[in-house]
Regions:
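A generic short-segment signal for beta-strand/edge and adjacent turn/coil regions
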Residues: 1-2, 11-12, 26, 76
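Anion-recognition interface
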Residues: 22
Length: 90
């Protein structure tokens, strides 16, 4: 599967950062699961809507464009930290 056919960046979807084409699954999610030790079979169980080919393609995309995906990981982490720092409504 060609990278340009399996990963897309569309304004308004995941902030324009890369997602598996035809889904709203960010490439960063797959990369973060792999960093936590998930193998391909585990990824298929965690993300059953993705084919093994789509998972592999997303990982190849990361190999060729790590800065873009890492930027999305950092952006997501900052957003999460900001949410965690807000007081919960009573």
């Amino acid at each position: 599967m060609l990278l340009e056919r399996c990963v897309s960046e569309t304004p308004g979807i995941n902030g324009g950062y890369p997602v598996v084409d035809g889904t709203r699954t960010p490439v960063r999610v797959i990369v973060e699961f792999v960093r936590q030790g998930a193998d391909e079979q585990h990824l298929q169980r965690l993300l059953p809507h993705l084919t093994l080919e789509e998972i592999r393609c997303a990982l190849r995309y990361y190999e060729t464009s790590p800065a873009r995906v890492d930027e999305d990981i950092e952006r997501n982490a900052r957003a999460w930290n900001e949410l965690q720092s807000r007081p919960w409504p009573a």
